[in-house]
Amino acid sequence: MTVRDPAAAAGATVGDLTESELLEVVLTGLAPAVRDGHWPVGTVAPGDDAALVPAPRGGTLISTDAMGEGTDFLHRWPAGPRTRGYDAGWKAVAQNLSDVNAMGGTASALVTALTLPPTTPVAWVRSFAAGIVGAVRHLGAPDCRVAGGDLGTGGRVHAAVTVLGDPHPGGVLCRTPAAADRDRVLAEGADLVHAQALPGGPRAAAPPGPGWAAAGLALLLTDRAELERRADALPAADRPSPRELARAVRAQLRPRPPLALGPAAVTAGLLTLMDVSDGLGKDAHRMAAATGGTGPAPAPWLDEAWLAEAAAPLRLVAALAGRSPEALVTGGGEDYGLLGLAWPETELPRGFTRIGRLVPAGARTPAGHRPLPESGWDPFGG
């Protein structure tokens, strides 16, 4: 059967549609973002061979990332939940918006390349498009134009998103300090600062903090029967509530990078910035290595009081997941918060907090701190 009306394709698969019909499904799903995407005279919205988007002076930020079925998500997890198209579309966009945010910029446009097996339900594709729109709208990227993309077929779902961004008028923040600041960082060190949640937002919409996405992944990858066995073995007071479990799973499937805080970091004069995608420890060590210099790199040390505060809410979920809450905080990835360096005298923007110190090699270690292990996610296993 060939479906000629994509709107009537509720039970159809990708293999039932022509390319034009499938493209119509996607474009219909993206229509709200295209309609609200501020396409001024002289630009070209999606539908042609290429889109034409406005370009600012001072360059364009570009980031690309991919999500693959079987590597980055499963349609059905061992624990039981499914990855809906909305979840995959949301996360594919969120992780790229996070990269632009980490440079202090504002996303201006995105394109998506989507590879689909012929057996993929059309409803899943429609939901994927809705997830793209949802992420752009609800994460706070109103100026990000959905500029088009590409569709193809393959053995597994694969989504690659490229985001363009406008740099902040005050410049960009990198993981390497500016040359004028590098010598002082190497000699004196600097404060490690972190941001996860937007200040003043609704509590229900706030991201839960470092470690929760990794806890969600650990739960999703555990067989449902095993989770039930573990829960039965725990005292009732030590079992996480359904709300806590949902919070962890949601942190993994629908991350919420704090998009307003990257530009705020530029305005405040932070020295460096990057997003926490592979784990607080691994990314902090990357930042330390990027400080430059010919001698040993400075080392990140974590404030023990901050670690205890961040780990405490994870205790019950971590126990069910079979993980240490402290290890989830320091080594869990995909939280998409912000990690940076600041001088002790710098007034931090709301939403940022000091979590430790970058300590020069051979310098006295700060009291009440512990070394931050270089733990986290490496897709190549190294």
Could you tell me what each predicted segment is?
Residues 52, 96, 104, 146, ...:
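Residue-level signal for inorganic ion chemistry
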Residues 108-223:
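Glycine-rich anion-binding loops of enzyme active sites
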